[in-house]
Amino acid sequence: MKTQMKKPWIEYELMWLIRPDLNQEEIKKEIEAVMKVLEESRRVQLNGKTTRKLAYKIGKYEEGHYVQMEFDGYGRIVKKLEKYLQVNEKGLRYMILRK
């Protein structure tokens, strides 16, 4: 009889830069959408959200909203999140780090 091994949960950190022309309600909706993508995750935690001046211009933007989140997941969850962030036009940049 085969025993199935459980996939280990891995800690990740998402740093996401959102366009500065969005209001607080739109930012909240974007964060909720990301949390919905991560619903399979064991843990999702919003660590911070700030507006900062960028070190260099990205497109026409000189500042942006930084969002930092932590979550536990594995490959399929991370790929699903990356796919969502790549097609999302409200985000400028993102980085997913394994902790």
Curated annotation (Swiss-Prot):
* Gene Ontology molecular-function annotations: small ribosomal subunit rRNA binding; structural constituent of ribosome
- Where's it found, cell-wise? Plastid, Chloroplast
List where this protein forms a coiled coil.
none
Q: Name one GO cellular component term.
A: ribosome
Q: Name one GO biological process term.
A: translation
| CDD domains membership | bS6
List UniProt keywords, sorted A-Z: Chloroplast, Plastid, Ribonucleoprotein, Ribosomal protein, RNA-binding, rRNA-binding
Entry-linked HAMAP family: Ribosomal_bS6
Q: Which family does it belong to?
A: Belongs to the bacterial ribosomal protein bS6 family.
> Its function?
Binds together with bS18 to 16S ribosomal RNA.
What protein name applies here? Small ribosomal subunit protein bS6c
Organism (species): Cyanidioschyzon merolae (strain NIES-3377 / 10D) (Unicellular red alga)
The organism's lineage is: Eukaryota, Rhodophyta, Bangiophyceae, Cyanidiales, Cyanidiaceae
Gene encoding this chain?
A: rps6
